[in-house]
Amino acid sequence: MDAVEHDLSDAQWSALQAVWSGCAYCGETDGTMQRDCVLPLSRGGRYALDNIVPACRSCNASKCNHEVTGWMRRKKLDERAFLNRLIEVRVMLASQFETS
């Protein structure tokens, strides 16, 4: 098995937590947020700024390796709002953390 590339810096994780202000999926603000891969590593995702969101313990455990939109539909979460916000956050943080 190939080694997983972990590109997310501590500064990027802090910025993600600040911008999302809680769980990216359900909005929960209590407790410590966990790093969740929108596209799971097992499905070809990367551990990088454009694929990580803060998630509460419950959402992170429930989503596991599921595809995000299907999982959100099953949980009756607002997938459209999540995807729109995900794009906004990616654009905002891409300019802040430009790579050379």
What are these regions (language model features)?
Residues 1-22, 80-97:
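Short, charged surface segments at domain edges that flank catalytic/cofactor-binding sites
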Residues 22-54, 63-75:
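Histidine-centered nuclease catalytic patch
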Residues 50, 61-100:
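A detector for short metal-coordination/catalytic motifs
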Residues 58:
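Conserved phosphate-binding loops in nucleotide/dinucleotide-binding enzymes
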